[in-house]
Amino acid sequence: MKGGKRVQTARPNRINSEIRAQEVRLTGLEGEQLGIVSLREALEKAEEAGVDLVEISPNAEPPVCRIMDYGKFLYEKSKSSKEQKKKQKVIQVKEIKFRPGTDEGDYQVKLRSLIRFLEEGDKAKITLRFRGREMAHQQIGMEVLNRVKNDLQELAVVESFPTKIEGRQMIMVLAPKKKQ
């Protein structure tokens, strides 16, 4: 259906004529207290200043209202929330797969990758996979995991260390150490 009624989204704060209280505790443009005044008087002061009257805390007795530019207030609020989102880092779990017979050169390459993941603040999941007859030599797998753990002890904390084999693999999870 074209041209249907648009549902108006509810604002988090009541402004101007939406305020229901008879009297309000008023705060000025610069944050100064102007005392308890009637709603009509508060609306007049806001209109004089050419800005809006915004209800900040409706549950207070009397409700606290502030004289401010509501559009600018919303802009600043969204800008600060975007800044906070930028600063948050999503921790990912990166996986590296080893085998009991992983050669020295491959081991060093995989170790460098693990170091990079941990320095970036991500967790690292080390999966040690057994094939065929390798299942008979589980102690070799444990030696590989212990070697990784010892090589990364300055950078990482072991979150989970395998005590037994799960299926045909052992899994160890490392988390980066907190920076002081």
From Swiss-Prot:
Monomer. Keywords: Cytoplasm, Initiation factor, Protein biosynthesis. One of its GO terms (cellular component) is cytosol. The keyword tRNA processing does not apply. Pfam families: IF3_C, IF3_N. The lineage of its organism: Bacteria, Pseudomonadati, Pseudomonadota, Gammaproteobacteria, Enterobacterales. It comes from Salmonella typhi. Its main location: cytoplasm. The keyword Hydrolase does not apply. Belongs to the IF-3 family. HAMAP family: IF_3. It is found in: Cytoplasm. GO terms for molecular function: ribosome binding; translation initiation factor activity. This is Translation initiation factor IF-3. IF-3 binds to the 30S ribosomal subunit and shifts the equilibrium between 70S ribosomes and their 50S and 30S subunits in favor of the free subunits, thus enhancing the availability of 30S subunits on which protein synthesis initiation begins. InterPro entries: T_IF-3_C_sf, T_IF-3_N_sf, Translation_initiation_fac3_CS, Translation_initiation_fac_3, Translation_initiation_fac_3_C, Translation_initiation_fac_3_N. GO terms for biological process: ribosome disassembly.
